[in-house]
Amino acid sequence: MKLKHLSLGILLLVLALALAACAGPAGPQGPAGPAGPEGPPGPEGPAGPAGPPGEAGAAAEMAELTCVECHNDTTLISGKRAAWSVSGHGSGEAFLRGTSATCAGCHSGGAFSARIAEGLNPDELEAGDPSPSRQDCRTCHQIHTTYTAEDFALETTDPVAFFAVEGATYDGGLGNLCVNCHQPRRVFPEAVDGMITDITEHWGTHHGPQSSMLLGIGGAGAEGQPGIHYSAVEDTCVGCHMGEGRTHTFAPNVATCQACHTDAENFDINGVQTEIQAELDRLGEALVAAGVLSENTLEGHPTVTEAPEGVATALYNWLYIHHEDRSLGVHNPPFTRALLEAAFAALEQ
């Protein structure tokens, strides 16, 4: 029996080998089966080494460039500030009046900028500046708004409609900025029964009526025309008081006058200042004699609270020319003469 089983096993092995020997070559690989589901992510590998530093970004580059555009080793800022520090605007104690609502819009640098931004007249502020400051770069220029050279642009150069003189507008180029303050605060009042009342120690046009003098308006008893310096001088105030070099002392330079008055050696061109000073002295003496003026100097102030219209007319024009405009006729010689003539005529009434 065992022999029979062994023989059968050998036979099966022989048959298997025979079949294997008769098999053909392997066929081509079948198509790939569908992808199986995605396996879970493996663990995070270690961080690679730090790469080289990149170039400076745009923000850092812009910040550096715009600062050094002004804050550099030139005298661009220091020179202007040195000149400004000795100017009337950059020195003195006038800024202390900025705590008053009626004064802050011109006497405080910060309040001036704020009211210009809001489009207000000097008399439209509701409150004074609790911390008034002298006028500085930011008062007239748009400092630190773009951090580029555009920051030196003026706060405004729009024509200025006077807030006290009805219907009057000043359009003098860059000088328009100045006229936002350098304009009359009052006009000559109407007489009541031949008398002018409410005269105070600080009566008159108030400080800075140079713009109205240039336009030939704002006086008492006289009508004028715009002076030649309003129409012929480019940028009016800026043209004369800063010149081509834009000097920030604001002291006028005779060299500017010499563009037209080639032989000028001072501001007394054709003797106009000598003439006007003599007439002012004569008028001041008459007003002191009339008992309405304390003294015939820059320290002189009205000593009465009311006066006849003629006397008040003379006093108003003396204050306008002597105390407030202070150009001794340079701003508008014909109108200055007309104001003095009206003053003397009024005293004789």
What are these regions (language model features)?
Residues 2-10:
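Bacterial N-terminal signal peptides that target proteins for export
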Residues 60, 73-97, 104-279, 326-330:
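Inter-heme linker and motif-flanking segments adjacent to c-type heme-binding CXXCH motifs
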Residues 62-70:
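Short, contiguous pre-domain boundary segments
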Residues 265-273, 277-349:
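Mature extracytoplasmic or organellar-lumen-exposed domains after removal of signal/transit peptides
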